[in-house]
Design a protein with these regions (language model features):
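Bacterial N-terminal signal peptides
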Residues: 7-14
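Extracellular carbohydrate-recognition regions
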Residues: 20-43
């Protein structure tokens, strides 16, 4: 009996330790969706439509951008010394084949997850890494946004390899800020999701699930 109790206690300890080394960003519930900050991109004709769904792996967010662009943001502190890795499970059902995503006229992505560090008094001074699910570029491609040098697009997934299927990816945000922005960031200030097609005037459909930070 004593050995069984010790085994149970040890299992609970390991479970708690595992949870302590993860920070979930979104629950993807109707209640959460109603509280998230929605920002329409300046000049866009319409907002991206976001809805909640559920599958065997839990809740997910569906994004439909039809000549539209708006993001969902959450101000949240992330300790990058403790949990430097972002984990994203996502899927693109309808992509944006043929556009030049690294130009102003084609700067649309079927799915994006931004990580944001405040570096000044206004949002325009913030530094961001824009992890994207590209329709045309290759994994690990990166380039500064054609609209602002303070945001860098980094390709984590591409529909050339994974189209209309769930895929989980991981990135070391702390190291990426060092490499891309030359900044040693100890704490993030926010995370945002966006699907946008306002430049290409096309339609994209994507899904997001299980976005969290981890220690490894």
């Amino acid at each position: 009996m004593k050995n069984i109790l010790l085994s149970i206690i040890f299992s609970i300890f390991l479970f708690s330790l595992s949870n302590a080394n993860e920070k979930v960003i979104f629950d993807f519930t109707e209640n959460e969706l109603s509280t998230l900050e929605v920002r329409k991109v300046r000049g866009a004709d319409a907002k991206t439509i976001y809805t909640i769904g559920k599958n065997d792996n839990g809740n997910y967010l569906k994004a439909v951008a039809d000549n539209a662009a708006s993001g969902l943001g959450k101000e949240i502190k992330i300790d990058l010394d403790a949990t430097p890795y972002i984990n994203i499970t996502w899927k693109v059902e309808k992509d944006l084949k043929g556009i030049k995503e690294n130009t102003k006229k084609g700067h649309d992505f079927a799915a994006r997850v931004f990580v944001i560090k405040k570096t000044g008094a206004t949002p325009l001074s913030n530094r961001a890494i824009n992890y994207v699910y590209s329709s045309n570029l290759n994994i690990d491609d990166y380039k500064r946004s054609p609209y602002t040098k303070k945001s860098i697009d980094y390709v984590l997934s591409t529909t050339k390899k994974n189209f209309d299927e769930w895929i989980t990816v991981k990135a070391n945000v702390k190291e990426d800020f060092k490499k891309l922005h030359k900044l040693d960031v100890k704490e993030l200030d926010g995370v945002a999701i966006m699907a946008d097609t306002d430049n290409s005037k096309m339609k994209a459909i994507s899904y997001y699930q299980n976005i969290y930070f981890s220690s490894e």
